[in-house]
């Protein structure tokens, strides 16, 4: 099963959607983002958030395998560009090597003083033959009829074993920092990302509570304003 949920430019006005769209059972975006999938005997939640006061994203995977032993492959898509800009293969040139915290480290040719560091709680790295995901298309551009195609660098797959009739939790952290500070991440525990994401969700929930989010009086005030 391919649980990638994205779309790429096709011929004419018809985008090519990946197989993951078929297995997506739920999606939420409420301060943090969560994708839920069901495929065969596998159930998976992918939960992610930008950490507060830190140039770091946390991704938590919770996978339930209700069948025989299975394998899982995660392909991190990496990019380095200005916000709202697009990128091509020629823009994504990196020095890339495995690191000591379960992931890999990238130094962009466009900014050699910076380092992109990925850490993972488990799994093994496997180099990919095809290292670029080309012409990814975002729905915002489709809706606005603009040609915002993007490309990502994907040098490695992370592979995991899912024991039969088991539940597995995986944490990924990715951050950007000056090269001289390398490394800044430690290898996370299986639940590290979930804990960090919960802190972010608590923060957004507190903002809503303070603002009276969901209160008719608050909504009326916004309308008047």
Where are these regions (language model features)?
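Hydrophobic beta-strand positions in extracellular immunoglobulin-like domains
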Residues: 48, 62-63, 174
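A generic structural motif
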Residues: 1, 38, 62-64
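An extended acidic
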Residues: 1-33, 114-128, 180, 199-206
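Extended, loop-rich substrate-binding clefts of extracytoplasmic carbohydrate-active enzymes
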Residues: 6-52, 131, 135-149
């Amino acid at each position: 099963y391919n649980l990638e949920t994205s779309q790429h430019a096709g011929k004419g006005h018809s985008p090519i959607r990946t197989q993951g769209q078929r297995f997506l059972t739920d999606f939420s975006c409420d301060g943090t983002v969560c994708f839920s999938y069901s495929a065969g005997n596998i159930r998976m939640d992918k939960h992610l958030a930008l950490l507060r006061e830190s140039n770091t994203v946390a991704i938590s995977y919770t996978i339930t395998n209700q069948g025989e032993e299975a394998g899982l492959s995660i392909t991190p898509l990496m990019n380095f560009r200005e916000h709202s800009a697009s990128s091509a293969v020629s823009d994504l040139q990196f020095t890339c090597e495995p690191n000591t915290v379960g992931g890999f480290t990238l130094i962009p040719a466009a900014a050699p003083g910076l380092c992109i560091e990925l850490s993972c709680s488990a799994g093994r790295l496997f180099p990919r033959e095809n290292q670029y995901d080309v012409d990814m298309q975002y729905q915002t551009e489709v809706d606005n009829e603009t040609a915002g195609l993007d490309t990502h660098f994907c040098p490695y797959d992370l592979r995991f074993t899912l024991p039969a009739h088991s539940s597995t939790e995986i944490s990924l952290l990715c951050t950007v920092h000056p090269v001289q500070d390398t490394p800044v991440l430690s290898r996370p525990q299986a639940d590290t990302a979930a804990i960090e994401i919960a802190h972010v969700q608590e923060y957004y929930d507190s903002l809503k509570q303070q603002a009276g989010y969901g209160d008719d009086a608050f909504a009326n005030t916004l309308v008047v304003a």
